[in-house]
Curated annotation (Swiss-Prot):
Its main location: cytoplasm. HAMAP family: NAD_Glyc3P_dehydrog. Belongs to the NAD-dependent glycerol-3-phosphate dehydrogenase family. This is Glycerol-3-phosphate dehydrogenase [NAD(P)+]. It catalyses: sn-glycerol 3-phosphate + NAD(+) = dihydroxyacetone phosphate + NADH + H(+); sn-glycerol 3-phosphate + NADP(+) = dihydroxyacetone phosphate + NADPH + H(+). It comes from the Bacteria. The active site is at K192. SUPFAM superfamilies: 6-phosphogluconate dehydrogenase C-terminal domain-like, NAD(P)-binding Rossmann-fold domains. The gene is gpsA. GO terms for cellular component: cytosol. Its EC number is 1.1.1.94.
Length: 340
C-alpha cells in the first residue's frame, strides 16, 4: 500500500484519487476550498467538480497542504499549469525526503513555455526528487468517475519509475501503458488542447465532418512537427497521448476545450466563454505558449497561429478558416515527414 497525496481537487484530481483508493492505497487529497474538502470527508462527493459520483470513504481530504503531505512517499499533482510554481514552492518547504512526483496536468507553463516536468525539476531540489513521472492519455474525468474503461500512459526517464506508477493505477477499468518518451507524452497531452479548441470552432460554425476530420489530421501533423523538434519520438504522437487524446478531446462534449471553441464558433467572445465555463480551459494558455515556441524554434504551425490570432488578436473565426484554406498548395507527404 502506497501513501499518496493528490494535490488538486478538481474533476481530474478527484477521479484519479478514486482510482487509487479503489486499488487499496492510502489516499489523501488536498484542495484550497475548505468547504469542498469537508464535503469529500462527510458526504464522499465532490459536487462542484465531479457531481453525482460517490467517492470511496477511504479518501481523506485536507485544506492544509502541510497536513496532507505528512509521511507520504508519492504525490500526484493535478493543478492548473499557471499554479504549479506557487504550489511547488510551498511543497518544497514541507517535504523532507525524496519522493516520487507524478503529474497529470496537460499544459505548457505560460510565460516560459516549459513542460510541467521541467517546472517540477526547476522548483524542487534534486535531493527531494526520487522520480518525475507523467500520467496522460484520452481520459475524461466524468467517465473515469463512472469506472468506465479508460487507457492512459505513464512516462518517465527511468522506465522502472513509469512501471511503478503503472502498478499504482492499473485495475480492471483503468489500464496503463508505459513510455520512456516523457517529452512526447507531455507535448501530446498539452498541444491537443489547441486542436480541440479549433475543432469546437468548426462545429460551432457548422462546417461539417469533412472540415473537422481535416482539422484533426492536420492538427496532429502540427503536434508531431513541434514535438519532434523538441526531442519527442514521432511514434508517441500516433499513440494514446497523441492521436488518442486528440480524438477524445476533439469529439466529446465532456471536453472543456471543445465546448469553449464551440461557443467561440457561435459568436461568443473569449471573455464570455471563460466566464461561462467556470473551470480552467488549458487550451487558451497553451495556444499562446505553443505559438511562442513555434516562432522561437521556427516550426510551421498554421492552425495554432490562426487560433492565436482569434484568441489574442481579435481575428474573426470565419476569416481564420479562410486563411487556412487559402494557404499555398503543398504535398501532404512532404508536410508530414516526422510521421513517416
Amino acid at each position: 500500500m502506497t501513501k499518496i497525496t493528490v494535490v488538486g481537487a478538481g474533476s481530474w484530481g478527484t477521479a484519479l484519487a478514486m482510482v487509487l483508493a479503489d486499488n487499496g492505497h492510502d489516499v489523501r487529497i488536498w484542495g484550497n476550498r475548505p468547504e469542498l474538502m469537508d464535503e469529500i470527508n462527510t458526504k464522499h462527493e465532490n459536487s462542484r467538480y465531479l457531481p453525482g459520483i460517490t467517492l470511496p470513504s477511504t479518501i481523506v481530504a485536507y485544506s492544509s497542504l502541510e497536513e496532507a503531505l505528512v509521511d507520504v512517499n508519492t504525490v500526484l499533482l493535478v493543478v492548473p499549469t499557471k499554479a504549479y510554481r506557487d504550489v511547488l514552492q510551498e511543497m518544497k518547504e514541507i517535504v523532507t525526503e525524496p519522493i516520487t512526483w507524478i503529474h497529470a496536468s496537460k499544459g505548457i507553463e505560460p510565460g516560459t513555455s516549459k513542460r510541467i516536468s521541467e517546472v517540477i525539476e526547476e522548483e524542487i531540489p534534486e535531493h527531494l526528487i526520487k522520480d518525475v513521472v507523467v500520467l496522460s492519455g484520452p481520459s475524461h474525468a466524468e467517465e473515469v468517475g463512472l469506472r468506465q474503461a479508460t487507457t492512459v500512459t505513464s512516462a518517465a526517464k527511468r522506465m522502472e519509475a513509469a512501471e511503478e506508477v503503472q502498478d499504482l493505477f492499473m485495475n480492471s477499468y483503468f489500464r496503463v501503458y508505459t513510455n520512456p518518451d516523457i517529452v512526447g507524452v507531455e507535448l501530446g497531452g498539452a498541444l491537443k488542447n489547441i486542436i480541440a479548441l479549433a475543432a469546437g470552432i468548426t462545429d460551432g460554425l457548422g462546417l461539417g465532418d469533412n472540415a473537422k476530420a481535416a482539422l484533426m489530421t492536420r492538427g496532429l501533423t502540427e503536434i508531431a512537427r513541434l514535438g519532434r523538434k523538441m526531442g519527442g519520438n514521432p511514434l508517441t504522437f500516433a499513440g494514446l497521448t497523441g492521436m488518442g487524446d486528440l480524438i477524445v478531446t476533439c469529439t466529446s462534449v465532456h471536453s472543456r476545450n471543445w465546448r469553449a471553441g464551440n461557443m467561440l464558433g457561435k459568436g461568443h467572445s473569449l471573455e464570455e466563454v471563460l466566464e461561462s465555463m467556470g473551470m480552467v480551459v488549458e487550451g487558451v494558455r497553451t495556444t499562446k505558449a505553443a505559438h511562442e515556441l513555434a516562432e522561437k524554434m521556427e516550426v510551421e504551425m498554421p492552425i495554432t497561429a490562426a487560433l492565436y490570432d482569434v484568441l489574442f488578436n481579435g481575428n474573426n473565426v470565419k476569416d481564420a478558416v479562410g486563411s487556412l484554406m487559402g494557404r499555398v498548395r503543398k504535398h501532404e507527404v512532404e508536410a508530414i515527414p516526422d510521421l513517416l
